[in-house]
Swiss-Prot record:
One of its GO terms (cellular component) is plasma membrane. It is found in: Cell membrane. SUPFAM superfamilies: V-type ATPase subunit E-like. It comes from Saccharolobus islandicus (strain Y.N.15.51 / Yellowstone #2). Component of the A-type ATP synthase that produces ATP from ADP in the presence of a proton gradient across the membrane. GO terms for molecular function: ATP binding; proton-transporting ATP synthase activity, rotational mechanism; proton-transporting ATPase activity, rotational mechanism. It is a peripheral membrane protein. This is A-type ATP synthase subunit E. Keywords: ATP synthesis, Cell membrane, Hydrogen ion transport, Ion transport, Membrane, Transport. Belongs to the V-ATPase E subunit family. One of its GO terms (biological process) is proton motive force-driven plasma membrane ATP synthesis.
């Protein structure tokens, strides 16, 4: 074997070793690239999922806040219209106090209360419009004092001086009690009910 052949053989062997090493290095580089790529994809997928979850939570929170705000707005609007009904009823009291049934009811309450006082002094408060009706029932009874109250819309309020108790038969109080007990029904009539 001559020198050239030996050199060729040697070169071929070195070439094969270099080629093998390059192939191994290339495979290792591809493996590292694939691992890095997979790791980056996993990392960013996790970040994207976290952002999606956070955004969903924010959207749900905003949705809940808006629902509460809408309910509050509806309640305010309902209350406004219920109060409008109440105001209309108050306006109608002027018509009620002119009826015979109203005057008969005042007389009946007063007659019953005066019979039960047995000498105790009482003060009867009434609206200026009801004073003549109250005076008719009281007559000359010395135990009864009549006072007008401009704030009263109708009805009477009786103060028992001996016991310090007051019995309130004023139309405003009765109306308030009836209205409060019927608030749900009024709401159902106005806005559709259950």
């Amino acid at each position: 074997m001559d020198f050239e052949q030996l050199l060729d053989k040697s070169l071929n062997k070195v070439r094969e070793e270099i080629k093998t090493e390059l192939s191994k290095s290339l495979d290792e580089a591809i493996k590292l690239l694939n691992e890095g790529h997979t790791k980056i994809i996993q990392e960013y997928t996790q970040r994207i999922n976290e952002l999606i979850t956070k955004t969903k939570e924010e959207i749900e929170g905003e949705k809940a806040r808006l629902e509460v705000e809408n309910k509050r707005t509806l309640l305010v609007e309902k209350e406004y219209w219920i109060n409008k009904v109440y105001e209309r009823v108050l306006e109608k009291i002027g018509e009620v106090v002119k009826t015979k049934e109203y005057k008969d009811a005042i007389q009946s309450i007063l007659n019953k209360e005066i019979k039960e006082i047995e000498g105790e002094k009482i003060t009867v408060y009434c609206s200026p419009n009801d004073k003549s009706t109250v005076e008719k029932v009281v007559g000359n009874n010395k135990n009864v004092t009549i006072k007008t109250d401009d704030k009263m819309l109708g009805g009477i309020r009786i103060y028992y001086e001996g016991s310090g108790l007051t019995r309130d038969f004023s139309l405003k109080l009765i109306l308030d009690q009836v209205f409060d007990s019927m608030r749900g029904k009024i709401s159902d009539m106005l806005f559709g009910g259950k």
